[in-house]
Regions:
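Surface-exposed beta-loop interaction hotspot
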Residues: 124-168, 184
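Tryptophan-anchored aromatic micro-motifs
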Residues: 22-36, 154-171
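Phosphate/adenylate-binding glycine loop and adjacent helical scaffold
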Residues: 109-124
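Preference for intrinsically disordered or flexible, low-complexity segments
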Residues: 116-118, 127-130, 137, 177, ...
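Amphipathic hydrophobic-ligand
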Residues: 39-45, 103-105
Length: 226
C-alpha cells in the first residue's frame, strides 16, 4: 500500500497507535454520495469525534450524522487496539479495508488523507465485481476556519507533480520511501496523457485517458481504470 506526501515526519518510528492519535479531535463536514460515473447523489452533514482516554491508550469515537429529514444518528466505538486491516502513515493518513478481494464477494476500502486542520476520506465499495456509489467525506477540525478547496478542474490537474511515495507493509516492516513524479498533459480536446516515475532508477510509465464528463477513462491495460 502506498501514498504520496510532500512532507516526511521527523520521527518515522511512531507506532500505529501514535499515528492514529494524529486524528484526535472533532471533525465537522459531510458524507457525499457520488455515482461511479461522478454524478452527485446526496449529502448529509456529519461530525466525527475522536477522543483519547486513559493517557492516550484508549480511543472513544463517535460518528454523528444529521439527515435533513430524520433525527440525528449516532454510532459509538471504543477501542484500545487496531486490526491488521487498518494501517496509518506518519502524518495520520490511513487506509483500512478488506484484506482479501474476489469477483464473487463484497469488499472495499476507506482511504484517508490529513493535512493540518483538514481531512479528506474516500470509501470505495464493490458488490461482487461492480463498483458501488462512492462516499466522499470532506472535513475540517471544529473551531478552525480551514478553507474548502474548489472542485478539481482538468486545467488544475495538468502539469508536473513531484512528491514522496511512502510504502507501508501489512507485516509492519519499516516503511520505504521513494521520489515520485506525475506529469499530466492534455493532448487533445478529450484526451490526456499521464506519465509516472517512481524512483530515479525506474522507467517512466505512460498511459492515455479519455475524458468523458466527470470521468477520465484509461482503457489500454488489461484492467480498465477511471
Amino acid at each position: 500500500m502506498s501514498t504520496s506526501s510532500f512532507e516526511r515526519s521527523s520521527n518515522p518510528t511512531l507506532s500505529q497507535w501514535q499515528r492514529l492519535l494524529k486524528n484526535a479531535g472533532t471533525w465537522q463536514g459531510s458524507f457525499a454520495q457520488i455515482s461511479p460515473v461522478g454524478e452527485f447523489l446526496s449529502e448529509v452533514r456529519t461530525e466525527v469525534e475522536l477522543t483519547p482516554s486513559d493517557e492516550g491508550k484508549a480511543m472513544h469515537q463517535e460518528v454523528r450524522r444529521y439527515p435533513a429529514d430524520a433525527p440525528p444518528q449516532v454510532q459509538i466505538l471504543d477501542y484500545r487496539s487496531l486490526n491488521r486491516a487498518t494501517l496509518f502513515f506518519e502524518n495520520g493518513a490511513f487506509s483500512q479495508g478488506s484484506m482479501q478481494w474476489g469477483p464473487f464477494s463484497s469488499f472495499g476500502a476507506e482511504l484517508g488523507l490529513i493535512a493540518g486542520d483538514r481531512r479528506l476520506r474516500l470509501v470505495q465499495l464493490f458488490e461482487k465485481n461492480e463498483l458501488r456509489p462512492l462516499t466522499l467525506i470532506r472535513e475540517r477540525k471544529q473551531g478552525t476556519e480551514a478553507p474548502e478547496r474548489p472542485a478539481l478542474s482538468l486545467s488544475a490537474l495538468v502539469g508536473t507533480w513531484k512528491g514522496k511515495a511512502v510504502t507501508q507493509y501489512a507485516d509492519l516492516r519499516p516503511d520505504t520511501y521513494s521520489d515520485t513524479q506525475l506529469t499530466v498533459e492534455q493532448i487533445g480536446p478529450t484526451q490526456i496523457r499521464q506519465t509516472i516515475r517512481l524512483g530515479a532508477d525506474s522507467p517512466p510509465l505512460s498511459s492515455t485517458g479519455q475524458i468523458e464528463g466527470s470521468q477520465i477513462l484509461f482503457k489500454e491495460g488489461m484492467q480498465p481504470v477511471q
